[in-house]
A protein has these predicted regions:
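Tryptophan-centric aromatic hotspots in well-structured domains and transmembrane helices
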Residues: 52-54, 119, 123, 163-164, ...
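Basic, helix-initiating cap at the start of DNA-binding domains
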Residues: 1-43, 58
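Short hydrophobic/aromatic patch on the recognition helix
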Residues: 43-53
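All-alpha amphipathic helical-bundle segments outside canonical DNA-binding/catalytic cores
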Residues: 118-123, 140-156, 175
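C-terminal peripheral helix-coil segments that are non-catalytic and often amphipathic
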Residues: 1-4, 82, 86, 93, ...
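Alpha-helical DNA-contacting segments of helix-turn-helix folds
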Residues: 58-67
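Hydrophobic alpha-helical connector segments
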Residues: 72-101
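Amphipathic alpha-helical packing segments from all-alpha helical-bundle domains
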Residues: 104, 114-141
Length: 202
């Protein structure tokens, strides 16, 4: 569980602490990162960091989430196709800013159960919930059938393809690639009409 905060810091100060933590991650990697180092870099008391986040994994996960420009929970375009395209744009924007950092953290997470748990709690689960909410809104609007068997796999498909292309092809899943994936694989399974012609790209 995420530790309960016992004191308040301003959003501006919180962002400074997040940026300090991420800067140190980029410079030295996860294993070398310490709460003491973040405190020194941000000129903050170490006790404040522990009081706010409790552990290094929780701070790292919160920093990644807190510095994202677009949160999927805020996406609501009025249609499922629009929501999923916006989600794809947000995912590409977030991944593109710190590809090397995310790869390093992914590797560290599978060796550190506490970090993996924190990343799931702070990053993955909220995004899965947001995508599921998009699907639920689509059901309520009558865009897709409530018993459509593909509905439960939308989050896994969209999040999984981001990682899969890098592993299979050695290339990032950019916005154009994700849009083609949505049009060719996700929308047809959901019974949504593709809105653009899917072309073959290298």
């Amino acid at each position: 569980m995420t530790p309960q905060r016992r004191s308040k810091i301003t959003p501006e100060r919180e962002l400074e602490l997040y940026e300090a933590a991420l800067d140190l991650l980029r410079e030295s990697g996860y294993e070398a990162l310490t709460m003491e180092g973040v405190a020194a870099r941000s000129r903050c008391g170490k006790s404040t960091l522990y009081r706010q986040w409790g552990t290094k994994p929780q701070l790292v996960a919160a920093a990644l989430r807190g510095t994202r420009c677009v949160k999927l929970a805020d996406v609501d375009t009025g249609s499922l196709a629009g929501d999923l395209r916006a989600a794809a744009c947000a995912a590409v924007e977030g991944a593109g800013r710190d590809t090397a950092l995310m790869h390093a953290l992914s590797h560290a997470a599978f060796q550190n159960p506490e970090l993996l748990c924190a990343l799931r709690e702070n990053l993955i689960e909220p995004e899965v919930a947001a995508i599921n909410a998009m699907v639920e809104r689509a059901v309520a609007r009558g865009e897709i059938a409530p018993d459509n068997p593909a509905a439960e796999f939308v989050a896994a498909q969209l999040m999984g393809v981001m990682r899969a292309r890098q592993m299979v092809e050695g290339r990032q899943a950019d916005e154009a690639y994700l849009h083609r994936f949505l049009e060719a694989a996700v929308f047809p399974a959901l019974g949504l009409r593709a809105t653009s012609r899917v072309a073959s790209h290298p």
